[in-house]
Amino acid sequence: MAAPPGEAPLTAATNIEPFYVLHKGGAAASSSSSSAPSLPSSGRARRRIDVSGLASPNPKPGKRSRDDDAAEDDDDDELYERLRLDAFHRVWSKIQSTINEVLRGISLKLFDQVLRWVQESFSAVRSIARPSAAEVRQPYPLLTDVICRKIPTAFVLTKNAEFVDDITTFRDLAEYLESNGCHLAKLSATELSEKNGVGCCFRSLLRQLLSDVPDVADIFALASWYSAAENYDQPIVVVIDDLEQCSGDVLGELVMMLSEWVIKIPIFFVMGIATTLDAPRKLLSSEDLQRLEPCKLTLGSPSDRMNALVEAILVKPCAGFCISHEVAVFLRNYFFKHDGTITSFISALKLACSKHFSVEPLSFLCMGMLEEDRENFWHDKFNALPQELRKYASGLPSCTREKDSTKSGDNMVDGLSELMNIQKDWSSVLLCLYEAGKHGKVQLLDIFCEAVNPDLHTQKAPNLPNEKSGTSRRFIDQVMDTIRYLPVETLFCLLEVWSIHLNGMDKITNKVKELQSTTISTDSVRITKDKWPRRSTNSTGNSTVALNDKVAMLLDDVTRKFLVSVECLPFHEIVCFKNVSILQSALIGNPRRMVQLDLVKSHKHLKCSCCRKNGIAVLASMHDTSIMCNLAQEYGDVINLHDWYISFDGIINSVHSKIKRKPHTSPSKKKSKPVAAESEAMIQARFCRAVTELQITGLLRMPSKRRPDLVQRIAFGL
């Protein structure tokens, strides 16, 4: 970070330092200060832990120097930052493993269908003819019948907006088929392009099957390999994950070539289709389509996968990390308006998790949610906190009503334990809402966004079945309306599922059982009405309507009492990410402002010892581009190059002027070598390079021919 010394000559050709923009969410602290209590002015208490074991056993507070305190604070900073980083890795690892299990569980049904289809197709091909190994090795097809030249092909409709969500699915499908006794080969859209041709495509297929690919890649090499005893009784499955992006001519030529050998070499296709099942008809010719024997399979819709993911990672407390109402609404809008992919939603959630652990000083306590003895874990961690962080914990906005600070440690542990218990009941009630909303095609993500709204929790609100609560309960009210029109059989099944979700909530479970018994009696009355229609009355219909209203009123009452948002609970800031502005700027992006902010506050990211002591002042030890960006803040939309250079020259030469004015030190101290002042040509070269880097990053527009002495600023707003 220091300016290059004068004893080594510098030129732009020999010393071009790389230009780094290190962004670590520095703007997060300032933007989140409005929602969290401010820490001591040193700014270091938010990353301190108990390091009493590192201190001297007999400290003398009267003789400790400031340098020793600063060194100890630096060590505390690194230890505490490492603790939060470890907590993030552990929490996100749990979330990621849950995501993988959910997606694989959804895909297993499709995998079983594909495997069953492969086995049936292989049996059908073998029933036509079973050539011997010698016949397979013969360099010509075995049969010429048209019926025997059709390749069994499974078209898998994924319904995804982007192919990025299909990558994991087809990768797992290939592993699943290979583990169940199939020879596997994967062909990408790049290999099936006009640029590569069918020869490159077939060579790629051979490389995945044969251990030694001959120089001349032809179908006879594949036939010779398949005639071996260890390969003969297993089908060959070729997976093409993105059919729409392939070249129709290349794929058609491959189909025509392999179809001639389908009896000798049982090769089957599995092709992924993202749009509609008419895609093969648009891509391949009629002659090519006649060589395929299609089978249509469908993967679960993106909405089903999204509902399963939201239930596993946001509704159920799987890792101790949650998001606020504003963040949930932003993620939902980002999913629907950006590209509609599960991958983008997961990436945004991971970014929110990382921002939470980088901003919140006490976020490392989230790990306690994963511990079996979580209360002892929280007690130990709280006892290790310094006094500043204890005050910070008791001063959280959600805890400002707590008057007693003498037992703040117990209050925090009890508060986090109560938060977990309330969240468990919250998730149970939310799942009951979703089970009822399925009959009205209500998505779980929409209900979730309403359930995390802190304004929704009105425990003493009037419980009127026909009264709407406003737009904040739009989807929840839609669920209530759906319940009122459900038939008795569906209502009984719904109550059965509710009793499973509400396990552990005894009072609510008893009410559900009462409604179940009422449902059974109502159903028996309906059967009696069907047997003796003349003796029945209209009271049966009225009782059914009353029963539906009772179920809706029960769910509405449970919702108002137990659907408590996490933002209404004490200490929720520790586990809940609320700063949507950070997430919005990171995902939607404002790159010029972020680059400018990183340059102006470079010392916060680089953490060098020379610039850290005076973080506000512009020092010569800073990078030239950072110095120039700081000086540019003093100008308007245009900057005079001459004035800018004079300011830059003054900063650079301030080091040498301080050395000249430095008083003589004691003779006992070792004399340092004098630092020679830099030449004006070198300062001009450094100035020009810094201006060029600011132009490359998009912060400046270079001088025009009319005003060559002025440059124009592009980025503002700091």
Swiss-Prot record:
Q: List the disulfide bonds.
A: none
Keyword vocabulary terms for this entry: DNA replication, DNA-binding, Nucleus
Map motif Nuclear localization signal onto the chain: 659-666
GO cellular component terms attached to this protein's record = DNA replication preinitiation complex; nuclear origin of replication recognition complex; nuclear pre-replicative complex
Q: Where is this region: Disordered?
A: 26-75
Note whether DNA-binding occurs among the keywords.
yes
* Coiled coil regions, renumbered to chain: none
Please report what switches on or represses expression of this protein.
Answer: Reduced expression upon sucrose depletion-mediated cell proliferation arrest, and accumulates after sucrose treatment.
State any GO BP term from the record: response to sucrose
Q: In which tissues is it expressed?
A: Expressed at low levels in the shoot apical meristem (SAM), leaves, ears and roots (including root tips).
GO molecular function terms attached to this record: DNA replication origin binding
Which residue windows does the record flag with biased composition (Low complexity)?
26-43
Belongs to which family? Belongs to the ORC3 family.
Q: What does this protein do?
A: Component of the origin recognition complex (ORC) that binds origins of replication. DNA-binding is ATP-dependent. The specific DNA sequences that define origins of replication have not been identified yet.
- Record text on subunit structure and interactions: Component of the origin recognition complex (ORC) composed of at least ORC1, ORC2, ORC3, ORC4, ORC5 and ORC6. ORC is regulated in a cell-cycle and development dependent manner. It is sequentially assembled at the exit from anaphase of mitosis and disassembled as cells enter S phase.
Q: What is this protein called?
A: Origin of replication complex subunit 3
